[in-house]
Each structure stands twice: as C-alpha cells, then as structure tokens.
Regions:
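Substrate-binding cleft/loops of secretory-pathway carbohydrate-active enzymes
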Residues: 126-129, 134, 215, 224, ...
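Boundary/entry segment of secreted carbohydrate-active catalytic domains
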Residues: 32-54, 303, 365
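Substrate-binding cleft of secreted/luminal carbohydrate-active enzymes
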Residues: 326-344, 348-349, 356-421
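Aromatic-lined carbohydrate-recognition surfaces of secreted/lumenal glycan-active proteins
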Residues: 116-122, 215-222, 264-314, 357-367
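Active-site-adjacent "subsite" loops/lids of carbohydrate-active enzymes
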Residues: 37-39, 49, 119, 124-208
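Aromatic-lined carbohydrate-binding/catalytic grooves of carbohydrate-active enzymes
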Residues: 67-100
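Catalytic domains of carbohydrate-active enzymes, especially glycoside hydrolases
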Residues: 54-80, 208-213, 326-329
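Short, acidic/polar
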Residues: 48-63, 194-205, 309-324, 342, ...
Length: 421
C-alpha cells in the first residue's frame, strides 16, 4: 500500500512536471515566426484537376486562406493531366472535352491570383496495384520490360519474355497481392530507355508550361527487394564484373548460368550501390532537363523522412542529392502524428540541407487543424523554409463546411493581410 501511495504521489509530481514542460514547449512553438518568403504550399491530388470548376475552387481557397504555392499532381500513374504527346490523357478527364487542359487552366488561374504552381510528378510509379490502365498505349503495355521486378519473381520472370502477356500478368498479380506494402508498378531507373522516357516527359512539361517548379515524387524504389529484372541484373553484372578477381568472376559466371541472381546475391553491397547510383543519375538527368528549359524553376523532391531508411530501404540517397546540388529543395514526407518524431525529422533534414531549402511535408490528413498548426510552428522553429500540407483534397470535404480546415489553419498562423491580397 505504501508503495502504491508513493507511486501515486510520484505520478502526480511527474504529471505536473510533464505539463509544465509541455506548456513551455507549446509557448516556444507558438512564438516561432515565419521565415522570410516562406513557402506555404498545398499538395493537390489529381482528382481536384478534373474540371475548370474544381481548379477555380482550389485556387480561390488557397488565395483566401493565405497559401502561396500549389503542387499539382499532373502525372499520377504514367498519365497526363495536361496536353501530352508522350503519355495518355488521364482516364479521369474522359468527361471533359479534349480541349480542356487542366495544367494550362491551373497556371492561368493561379498565376492570375499571385500563386506559384509546381508540377508534382510521380516519377517511377506508373500503375496502381489494384488495377491496370485502360489506355492500350500506356507504357505498362508498350514497354513491360521497363518495369521493376521483385526478388520473389526474379527467377520466374527470367523464363518469360516481356513481350508475352504472361510477363505483365504475373507482375500485376504479384503486386496486387502485396498491395498493403507496394503501391503499384514502378519503372526501373536501371533501364536506359525508361530513364530517357522520364526525362523526355519532364522536359516536355517545362518546355511548354510556365511552371515555377517541378517536384519529383516516387523517385525511389518500392523497397530494397526491387529491381531484379533481367536487364537490371545484367547491367549490374556488366558494371561490376570487370573489377573482380578473375577467379571470383569465373565462379560467378558459372553460377549465373543456372541462377540469374548469382551476382546480386554474392555482392549485396555493390548491388545496392549500383541501384542507388542509377537512381541518383536519373535525378541528375531530370534536373538538367528542367534547368535547360526553365533555368529559374525550382527542382524539389518528396522524400522518405528518415535519411538512413531512405538510403537503405528505398535506395534514395537524398543526402547526396542535396550535397551535389541535384535538388533545390527537399520535402521530407514527415506525416507522423507524433510531434517529437516530426520535430526530429525536420531538424535532421535542416541539418543535412545546408543552403538548400527544406519544406516540411505535413500529413494533415492524419491531423486535426490544431495539430497541423502545431507541426507548422515546429517546422518553423526547426528552421524549415516552408511547408507543404498533404493534401488540399483531404482538407476540403463536405464535413468541413461549417468551419473549413484551411480556415482554422489560416486564422492561427497567417496575418490577416495574407488572405486578403
């Protein structure tokens, strides 16, 4: 009993101390001021780009509530929410006349309202896990050999020609069965023709549209189990074999006769390095494509927030991208509702970014308006140059009609003049 009483007393003391710490922290957070030229952005899903009315509405909301930048998802799954000769028009636009160009309408309306527009481009992810595209010209049908293959299917897929319907069928079925972890079908940056296609898509975008920036998303591997496609493994073998001792090379060549994974299995560190370097090479190509067409456009990347996890599991070396100047801004997708973890992730990105910008990616879809405000203030406190809320669409449903989510965020954070420009 005495121990129980002591525990209660101690718990009360600890609770009081914790409350005091929390109040001090929150006071400090509230005091954080916005940096000069803060990027106040919204991620806009492609579902909000399907009509002139929906675009006009999102621009009006952004302007009213003090946001200054829209990251619009104009390439969702290897399709186009703009006029493209390289990829099929998005299925969601079937109800609109062929003359309707969502990106052109958005740029005209948003720039007229004083907002910046960045093309949010899903790079490697090109098809959903749950269904395949309708358009017969979609690249999953035109070039199934460009798709990443998981380790689990590597030996099986090595016996099937990519031109056979069975190739895509097996890959699609496996991906559907793993949809809890894998978003869909990915293009492989190890495929030179796939990398060239992606570069052409981005180059076409910035050449024909007055974009303020391009954000690279899904610029990663689904996880370390990919890409074990026949081309990728052969490319690795060609890259690494010349540097091996002759005896080791002979042994691996002999093993590869019966096991297509002989080289990756024997050289796992080199295999990861090779895949990582090829992804970084793609980032370099995309940056060059943007800057050669539109020198002032900002190149940003939405990244896995933990830099070590990104490096090891997603093969996404965004630390090097920053150090090498391949991106102008990094956007860690710090969607966690856990405030201490969010603070650590943004602080880490700020420490790694140097002179490059950090935009805190905030998972508003998982947070209350008050929590979103708190995370924005924490991002400011940690030295972020701006923030991006995911997503506009999740914050503007019918249940927000009485007191809109964005209105609550705006009242708490932005001076009145921000919403009246």
């Amino acid at each position: 009993m005495r121990r129980a009483k002591g525990w209660v007393a101690l718990s009360g003391t600890a609770s009081a101390a914790l409350l005091l710490i929390t109040l001090v922290t929150l006071t400090s957070v509230r005091a954080a001021s916005a940096p000069p030229d803060e990027t106040r952005a919204l991620w806009v899903l492609r579902s909000s780009l399907t009509s002139p009315a929906s675009i006009d509405s999102l621009v009006a909301s952004a302007r009213t509530y003090g946001f200054n930048t829209l990251l619009a998802q104009v390439r969702g799954r290897g399709d186009a929410y703009y006029s493209s000769q390289l990829e099929p028009r998005a299925e969601d636009l079937q109800a609109q006349p062929a003359s309707f160009d969502p990106l052109a309408h958005l740029l005209s309306t948003a720039h007229g309202a004083g907002l910046k527009v960045h093309a949010w481009v899903n790079i490697n992810l090109v098809a959903s896990a749950s269904y395949l595209p309708v358009a017969p010209e979609h690249l999953v049908y035109a070039h199934p050999e460009w798709l990443m293959v998981p380790r689990a299917l590597a030996r099986d897929m090595a016996t099937v020609e990519p031109a056979s319907p069975a190739y895509l069928g097996r890959l699609a079925r496996w991906t559907r069965s793993e949809s809890g972890d894998i978003e869909g079908l990915y293009l492989s940056p190890l495929q030179p023709d796939a990398a060239a296609h992606l570069t052409a898509v981005v180059s076409d975008l910035v050449a024909r549209y007055a974009l303020d920036g391009v954000q690279l998303d899904y610029i990663r591997f689904p996880d370390e189990r990919f890409d074990f496609s026949r081309y990728a493994v052969a490319a690795f073998r060609s890259d690494v074999a010349p540097g091996l001792p002759a005896e080791v090379r002979r042994e691996l060549d002999a093993a590869a006769e019966s096991d297509p994974l002989a080289y990756p299995n024997a050289l796992p560190d080199e295999w990861s390095r090779f895949r990582r370097s090829q992804l970084s090479a793609l980032v370099m190509r995309l940056r060059t494509a943007v800057r050669s067409r539109r020198p002032d456009a900002v190149v940003s990347a939405a990244v896995t927030p933990d830099v070590e996890d990104a490096y090891a599991r997603r093969l996404q070396d965004w630390r090097t991208w920053l150090e090498s100047g391949l991106i102008d801004a990094v956007c860690p997708m710090a969607y966690t509702p856990e405030t201490p973890l969010f603070a650590r992730q943004i602080a880490s990105a700020r420490g790694l970014a140097g002179t490059r910008a950090v935009w805190a990616g905030i998972g508003a879809f998982r947070l209350s308006p008050a929590q979103t405000v708190q995370h924005i203030q924490i991002a400011r406190q940690q030295g972020a140059d701006g923030f991006v809320l995911f997503s506009y669409d999740s914050m503007t449903g019918a249940d927000r009609a009485l007191d809109p989510y964005l209105a609550q965020v705006s009242r708490a954070l932005f001076p009145p003049a921000s919403g009246s420009k």
